[in-house]
Each structure stands twice: as structure tokens, then as C-alpha cells.
Amino acid sequence: MLEQVDKAAEVSDDDLRRSFTTFRMELDLDMPPDPHSERYRTAVMDLYAWLHGSPYELSNESTDFELGRFVDVPFPYSTASGVTVGNHLMAIGQVIRTLDLAAGSRVLEFGAGWGNITVALAQMGHRVTAIDISQQFADLIQARASRVNATVDTMVGDFSMVDELSDSFDAILFFESFHHCTDHSSLLTSLHRIIAPGGRVLFAAEPIEEDFYAPWSLRLDGESLWAIRKNGWFELGFRTSYFMDALGRSGWSAAKVVCPGLPAADIWVARRAG
């Protein structure tokens, strides 16, 4: 199956994404009853090891690419796909519109990747810190920001860097990144330390679904299986009721902001409860 996907990728990004829809996996999993328990988390990690072929390593999340090639033409523009580019721009616009930040706000983006939102917010005059596991992504963000005379503070590390930060932020953003966290409960709790009074945490374009097959677990659609098996990425999905419960247990309340015409770009906005 991976061979067929790779062949589709050689044709175009659209063909690659169409190939993802041709397969998925259905599993009858006997998961521990308490989704907040360490036993449950261990079961998810065991499922990952079975799907990927070896236990999870944080280094799997790092992306290797040729920096110079993507400074001027980063993802999604590099795909040359009208659908992919259009959807991505819609999702980014939804984030910026939902944030609606006051001038000069402090923003932290976890898993900033290609830097599309980070650089856009920096161009708007916000003070942006971008954290990513990949040094190459950090270098790319700096190069892209420099091209537009914007300033971004980049840091290389994983989600655990939340415990090393000394600043507070008006907004903390996860865009297609929260679902890569192997210990999301601890992360949600730790965010309180760095959120400014009245600040918000945004979970944007994250796989949070009413009818997800488990409270939380690895996604079993074609694209996720490909990403787990080939790249070793951690690809979680969340049932809405579980996600809301996890937020509540961590001291957050949240509301959903729907993206018209693109459900995959819906946003959950969390604030301190009470």
C-alpha cells in the first residue's frame, strides 16, 4: 500500500491525497476503561509500536528537507495544488480572524512547522515565539521572517519546553500540532503557567470529532496510517466529549468556532475556567 501511495505522490499532491482515501483500518480494540489513566496511554503507545513497526521516538517528528528550496515556496505553495493551497489559506485565515489580537500581542505557536501563521502574525506586528522539534523548520522560519522584515523568536524543542518558558502569552496556538503530543493531559495543565490573564489557547485544524472510534487514540484513516508507518509521526484523534473533559480536568473551558465550508479547519478556543 505504501508503494502505491509513493507512486501517487510522484504524480501530484492531489493524486497523493486521493490515494489516502482508498484505504483505512478497522480495529476492535480492547482499551482500558479510563481514558485518563496511564494504562490507557500505554495501550495507545503499544498500538503505535504495532502500526509503525517499532516504539515511538521523538526524533521521528523532525522533518528533513532542503532549506533553500522552501524559503520562497514553502508548503502549501510547493504542492501546486489549488485545493491544498486554498484549504490551507482558509484555515490560516480562520485562525487569524478568530485570534483578532490587540496590537503587539505576545503569541506562542507550538509546532510551528513551515511558519505560515507565525510569519503572518509577526508581519502584523505581534511578538511571536515559535517552537518546533526541527532545527530546519526554525531556520526556515527565521529566513522567511527576514525576507519580510519581521521578527520571530524561534526555539527548537518539543512540547515539554512549556516547562522552560519564563514569559507569558496572550495567545497560545496549536495548528495541526496538538495531536502529535504523547502526553496531552500534562501539557494542558502546564499551559496555565504561561498564559497571560485573559489569554486564550487555540486548537486549530485538530482531529477532534463527535464520533471518533475511541476517547482518544491513533487515527486509522489512510493518511494517518501512511504518516505513522512511513514517517513515524504520532497521529492522534480525539472524541469531542473526551477532549472537553480533558480540558475541564485541566482547568480550561472551551468553545468551538466553526469554519464555514471547511470543517477540518474548525477551532476550539480555550480560556481559564471560572
Residue ranges and their predicted role:
Residues 1-92, 217-230, 267-269:
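N-terminal accessory regions of S-adenosyl-L-methionine
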Residues 116-161:
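Class I SAM-dependent methyltransferase SAM/SAH-binding core
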Residues 163-172:
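A short acidic, Gly/Pro-enriched loop at the edge of an enzyme's catalytic core
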